[in-house]
Each structure stands twice: as C-alpha cells, then as structure tokens.
C-alpha cells in the first residue's frame, strides 16, 4: 500500500515502515560517527524501547557500547491495508541493523506495567544473557493497570492549586490560542503519580534483583524532564511534575538496594525538551519547542533524542565526571536551560502572533520532526512507492 501521514490532533495515526527504518538508520549513523563509548554496559534492558528517548538509549547502548539489548514495548504490528505503529517499525529496523552488526537483540511486546511481562523478561534474561548490567526505564503511557489490584489509573495534565492561563499553538489550524487549564483534584494527582511516578520502576528493579538477573554493580536510570519557568506551571509544578517528583523519591530506595548489590547505582536523568509522541500532547509544548528550536539552532546547540542520549551515556552514565545536580540527578539538559536561551524564548513567547509564527518560531522544524517520528518527511524515502505494512520483528516474544 501507499502510506501517507494522517494527523489527528497531536497524533499521527499512520506510520511508514521505510521511513521509520531510515530514521533509525540515521540515529545509528550518528552514534557510529561519534565513536565508541568507553566503559559502557554490555547487557542492557530497555523498558520502553521503541520510540523517543528509550529507542535512542537502545541504539546508543548497542552501537555506542557494543551491548546486547533486550527491549520491552507495547506496539501494534501492521497488517494488509493497515499500517502498524511507528514503534513497531522502529523496533523491526533496530533488530535488522543490530543483527547485521552481530549484536544480540530480542524484544518483548506487551504491557510493561504487568507482572506477566516482567516474568517473560526475567525468563529471557536468564535464558540468553544470564544477567543485565544496565536497566533503562523510559515508559510513557497515559494509563496503567496496577498489577496487584487490577485498578486502572489514568494520568492527567493539569496544574496544581490554581487555574493556569497559557498561550499555545494549535498545530492543526496553525494559530496561537489562549487557553485555561483548571487545577487537578487530589484524585487526579494521585492517579497521575500512579501512572508516571516511580512505583513501577521500583517494581521492575525489585523483581530483577529477586530473580538474580541483575549483575553486581548494575546501574539503572529513569528519564525525566524539568524545564524552566515557562513550562513549570503546567509541567513541573503540575500533576505530571508530582509524578516526576515521585521518581526523585523512589530512586533513593532503588539506589540503596543497588548500592548494596555490588556497588550499583540508580539515577534519574534529566533530558531536554524534544518532539516525541508524549511531548506533543502537552498543551504548551508545541509553541515552546518551536521557539526553543529557533533559538538553539541559531546558537548551534539544537539536539534531538539521539544527541542527548549519546552525551548522557558518554559524559554521565559511563563517564568519570558525570554532570550531576545537587539532588543527585544526571543532567543532559543544560544547553536548553542556558539563561540566554531561556530569556530569548521568553521574549519571543510574548511576541508571537498568528501573523508571525513562521518568522519568530521554527514551527517548520517542529512539524518536520513531528512527522519524522512516524517515518514521514525523511530525505531519501520514496513515499510514492508501494510498501508492505506487515513487517515482522525477528526474535520477538509476544506477551
């Protein structure tokens, strides 16, 4: 079939297998060109491995550190007449290139919050790898079924304590709009923490430790975003921020248990704002990102997922002098938080109107990166060609 982008709101409901493969190849080429990372992990579990930062971590571990990787994700395969999800095609491409390089790659498709997927993962590690020495936690999900109680929690994106008026960019109509978000109830905050907080990360590490599949000295990290004051009301000081602060709490107990296990470590890693399927759903993010791209590209400091994660590995996860803040988090977002960058973004924020969107922001760059997520608008891909949407992932365990 010929596959074209079909965008509905902040999601593209189609994905292109050849485009997704080209996108993965581009990230692999970047890592290969940057060169091998010393003291890297050799057996890595990536939870949330199919898109965004999780995919970038899997690529960096494999092609930067020469690691065998086991990836966990929840994606839908394509079938005749219906494309699969971009994460499915990304993972199929990753497997293909890892295999060509002689690297072990196995994936598990299912709900990472469930006990069943944890069990299947532990079995796969025991059978193939023995143990893993690094666990990347990069799940982005709007809901979670609690594995012990069966209760379903939904996350909410709202401020806490007061309503927030904010400017946003309607990406469909391409207009600036003012909007108001009502504050979250306590139940909404608690539910968001249940979905996006640190409980599941801790459950994973506890299960892996108990099963004896974490190597002594193993490290784990979960990815987070902090941002600056422009986004704080909605993000860091809102319901999602409450979940991110829960990560900061939970990491302490995880760090203690790994430290006692042969001197291992657990850290929260703070990464910059990028276009992902998760970030495009946050009301003010498209405008913020369009402005941030404009300013950072002019300064020559613009980075996407792969550049961020490669530097996180090289400098902090594997380096001898990690970028660490006073709260013990690893930081890769310092170029975004450069006061000069933030001041320029803030100034432009107040000046943007419907008439000057394309002059004051890099909305064009934002739109291109958004389409890239789904395998579209990528140079060198023939979008008029007939492609088969049914792509198999070799070495896949279906949960």
Swiss-Prot record:
Signal peptide: none annotated. NAD(+) binds at residues 48-53, 74-75, 111-112, 139-140, 244, 274-276. One of its GO terms (molecular function) is NAD binding. InterPro entries: Eno_Rdtase_FAD-bd_dom, Enoyl-CoA_Rdtase_cat_dom, FabV-like_NADH_b, Trans-2-enoyl-CoA_reductase. Involved in the final reduction of the elongation cycle of fatty acid synthesis (FAS II). Catalyzes the reduction of a carbon-carbon double bond in an enoyl moiety that is covalently linked to an acyl carrier protein (ACP). Belongs to the TER reductase family. This is Enoyl-[acyl-carrier-protein] reductase [NADH]. It comes from Yersinia enterocolitica serotype O:8 / biotype 1B (strain NCTC 13174 / 8081). The lineage of its organism: Bacteria, Pseudomonadati, Pseudomonadota, Gammaproteobacteria, Enterobacterales.
């Amino acid at each position: 079939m010929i596959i074209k982008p079909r965008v509905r709101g902040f999601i593209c409901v189609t994905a292109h297998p050849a485009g997704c493969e080209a996108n993965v190849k581009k990230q692999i080429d970047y890592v290969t060109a940057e060169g091998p990372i010393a003291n890297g992990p050799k057996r890595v579990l990536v939870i949330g491995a199919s898109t965004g930062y999780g995919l970038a971590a899997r690529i960096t571990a494999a092609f930067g550190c020469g690691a065998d990787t086991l990836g966990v994700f929840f994606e839908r395969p394509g079938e005749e007449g219906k494309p699969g999800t971009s994460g499915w095609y990304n993972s199929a491409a990753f497997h293909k290139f890892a295999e060509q390089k002689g690297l072990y790659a196995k994936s598990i498709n299912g709900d990472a919050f469930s006990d069943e997927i944890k069990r299947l993962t532990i079995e796969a590690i025991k059978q193939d790898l023995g143990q893993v020495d690094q666990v990347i936690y990069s799940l982005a999900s709007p809901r979670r079924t609690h594995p012990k109680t069966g209760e379903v929690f939904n996350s909410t994106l709202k401020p806490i304590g007061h309503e927030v008026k904010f400017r946003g960019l309607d990406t469909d109509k391409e207009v600036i709009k003012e909007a108001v978000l009502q504050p979250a109830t306590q139940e909404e905050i608690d539910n968001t923490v249940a979905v996006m907080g640190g409980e599941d990360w801790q459950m994973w590490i506890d299960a892996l430790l108990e099963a004896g599949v974490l190597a002594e000295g193993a490290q784990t990290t979960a990815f987070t975003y902090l941002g600056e004051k422009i986004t704080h009301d909605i993000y860091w000081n809102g319901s999602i921020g409450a979940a991110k602060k829960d990560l900061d709490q939970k990491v302490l107990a995880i760090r203690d248990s790994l430290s006692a296990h042969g001197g291992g470590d657990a850290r929260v890693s703070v990464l910059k704002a990028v276009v992902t399927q998760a970030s495009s759903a946050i009301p003010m993010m498209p405008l913020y990102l369009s402005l941030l791209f404009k300013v950072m590209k002019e300064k020559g400091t613009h980075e996407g997922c792969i550049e961020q994660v490669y530097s996180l590995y090289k400098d902090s996860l594997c380096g001898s002098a990690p970028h660490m803040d006073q709260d013990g988090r690893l930081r890769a977002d310092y170029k975004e938080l450069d006061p000069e960058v933030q001041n320029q973004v803030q100034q432009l924020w107040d000046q943007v109107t419907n008439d000057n969107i394309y002059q004051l922001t890099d909305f064009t760059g934002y739109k291109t990166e958004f389409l890239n997520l789904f395998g579209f608008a990528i140079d060198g891909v023939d979008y008029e060609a007939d492609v088969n949407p049914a792509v198999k992932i070799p070495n896949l365990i279906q949960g």
